[in-house]
UniProtKB/Swiss-Prot annotation:
One of its GO terms (biological process) is positive regulation of Wnt signaling pathway. It comes from Gallus gallus (Chicken). Component of the PAF1 complex, which at least consists of CDC73, PAF1, LEO1, CTR9 and RTF1. Keywords: Cell cycle, Nucleus, Transcription, Tumor suppressor. It is found in: Nucleus. The gene is CDC73. This is Parafibromin. Tumor suppressor probably involved in transcriptional and post-transcriptional control pathways. May be involved in cell cycle progression through the regulation of cyclin D1/PRAD1 expression. Component of the PAF1 complex (PAF1C) which has multiple functions during transcription by RNA polymerase II. PAF1C associates with RNA polymerase II, is involved in transcriptional elongation and in histone modifications including methylation on histone H3 'Lys-4' (H3K4me3). Residues 338-352 have a biased composition (Pro residues). One of its GO terms (molecular function) is RNA polymerase II complex binding. Transmembrane segments: none annotated. Residues 273-282 have a biased composition (Polar residues). Residues 260-303, 325-358 are annotated as: Disordered.
Length: 531
């Protein structure tokens, strides 16, 4: 049986009449409730783990009846009549499918459970006015109709009885035919009579009982239909309802995997206390009688005790190395040494606990218009020279999600000598991917200008101002010296770094000033990090 959305499309394209009576929508000999769900997915549902929701028949039928209205007027009228509206992104695609312009739609979920419509019997179902009219008739007419039906059925049964084979006819035929032939003919005639009488009886009894049992049959049918499920095969499951095949199939695989894991629990040893019969529980334990062969169980063990021979041992499943080493290798395995308690001054965390990272993090803008990007961040901050991002693209450089730069600096030793050391810094342009514990290691951020750069950041004020962010993270702004300063950067606590368009020999002092400013900030606020 077709789904309600396909039936509605067929009636709409063929301009057939759709009857709405009470809480039911009637399509010829089938009917569905108004609030029955179709298999057309509502836009915006079924994403990011949310369950899918479907339009009801009433909402789609209301859209067809008011398709001439503009969408705002249609929404107001639907809200007045308390009917769910069809959302604007679904309106054009849904109307194109219902009007026959397209054969299918990507929003139709073929795997959704179908609501089976109730079949309306034209002979049994009667209109409400006819039922009221018959209720006003005298009771005698109904009794008279039933009596006439019974007399007609009895007359038909009597007619069949007259046609039954008579015994004297069998006696007359016995002279001309054998007993086997007569029995075969009699069996054929009786079989034919039984089938004929059975068919007539079914028709008459059905005609008599349809009036009184029709409501009970409808209730039973509705209960059966409500328990039905859509028959799924390998072919129907592998048919994706959308453009993304993995979204449908991988979800099914995950459900199958979860179900299989749930069916195979850990195998635990059976408890010793097994349920026993109460009659056996009450019986007293019978003392074991003497057995002359019990002594044989300990005889072999006593004879080989001095040779240390395991008479029940085996080499099955053992490797050559384990056989040659013998028991000596097993004796060398000593039990694990007990941990020696240490004084509090020498206490240290267990080796399996992961220590927090001390590598500082620098955040740069993700916009391609920024002077510093993931393509040239290593050239600017590590090599202290400016290389435009476009030039790096021409060289075939690939953009990475994050990069690790090695800053070379001179560190003063206690003896007064300086040693060149290398300190790592982590550079990222996707701050929303940072873990909550990583934000404590963020030491610098390059500001582009617009405030939307800090959307989703911690410490952001309700009005979207990043003032509190700059109080916890050192902010820098990189621009050309001939470009006008952004108004937002002017009013924020940001250190401006200016580069020349053509004088590349001036790049090194600019980036050295960046590192000096950052070092002073980290000494004061981030001294627990490595720098």
């Amino acid at each position: 049986m077709a789904d309600v959305l396909s039936v509605l499309r067929q009636y709409n394209t063929q301009k057939k009449e759709i009857v709405v009576k009470g809480d039911e929508v009637i399509f010829g000999e089938f009917s569905w409730p108004k609030n029955v769900k179709t298999n057309y997915v509502i836009w915006g549902t079924g994403k990011e783990g949310q369950p899918r929701e479907y339009y009801t028949l009433d909402s789609i039928l209301f859209l067809l009846n008011n398709v001439h209205l503009s969408h705002p007027v249609y929404v107001r009228r639907a809200a007045t009549e308390n009917i769910p509206v069809v959302r604007r992104p679904d309106r054009k695609d849904l109307l194109a499918y219902l009007n026959g312009e397209t054969s299918t739609s990507s929003s139709i979920d073929r795997s959704a459970p179908l609501e089976i419509g109730l079949q309306r019997s034209t002979q049994v179902k009667r209109a409400a006015d006819e039922i009221l009219a018959e209720a006003k008739k005298p009771r005698i007419e109904d009794e008279e109709c039933v009596r006439l039906d019974k007399e007609r059925l009895a007359a038909r049964l009597e007619g069949h009885k007259e046609g039954i084979v008579q015994t004297e006819q069998i006696r007359s035929l016995s002279e001309a035919m054998s007993v086997e032939k007569i029995a075969a003919i009699k069996a054929k005639i009786m079989a034919k009579k039984r089938s004929t009488i059975k068919t007539d009886l079914d028709d008459d009894i059905t005609a008599l009982k349809q009036r009184s049992f029709v409501d009970a049959e409808v209730d039973v049918t509705r209960d059966i239909v409500s328990r039905e499920r859509v028959w799924r095969t390998r072919t129907t499951i592998l048919q994706s309802t959308g453009k993304n095949f993995a979204k449908n199939i991988f979800a099914i695989l995950q459900s199958v995997k979860a179900r299989e894991e749930g069916r195979a629990p850990e195998q635990r040893p059976a408890p010793n206390t097994a349920p026993t019969d109460p009659t056996l529980r009450n019986k007293q334990p019978i003392p074991a009688a003497y057995n002359r062969y019990d002594q044989e169980r300990f005889k072999g063990k006593e004879e080989t005790e001095g040779f240390k021979i395991d008479t029940m041992g085996t080499y099955h499943g053992m490797t050559l190395k384990s056989v040659t080493e013998g028991a000596s290798a097993r004796k060398t395995q000593t039990p694990a040494a007990q941990p020696v308690p240490r004084p509090v001054s020498q206490a240290r965390p267990p080796p399996n606990q992961k220590k927090g990272s001390r590598t500082p993090i620098i955040i740069i803008p993700a916009a391609t218009t920024s002077l510093i990007t993931m393509l040239n961040a290593k050239d600017l901050l590590q090599d202290l020279k400016f290389v435009p991002s476009d030039e790096k693209k021409k060289q075939g450089c690939q953009r990475e999600n994050e990069t690790l730069i090695q800053r070379r600096k001179d560190q003063m030793q206690p003896g007064g000598t300086t040693v060149s050391v290398t300190v790592p810094y982590r550079v990222v342009d996707q701050p929303l991917k940072l873990m909550p514990q990583d934000w404590d290691r963020v030491v610098a951020v390059f500001v582009q200008g617009p405030a939307w750069q800090f959307k989703g950041w911690p410490w952001l004020l309700p009005d979207g101002s990043p003032v509190d962010i700059f109080a916890k993270i050192k902010a820098f702004h990189l621009k050309y010296d001939e470009v006008r300063l952004d108004p937002n950067v002017q009013k924020w606590d940001v250190t401006v770094l200016e580069l020349s368009y053509h004088k590349r020999h001036l790049d090194r002092p600019v980036f050295l000033r960046f590192w000096e400013t950052l070092d002073r900030y980290m000494v004061k606020h981030k001294s627990h990090l490595r720098f």
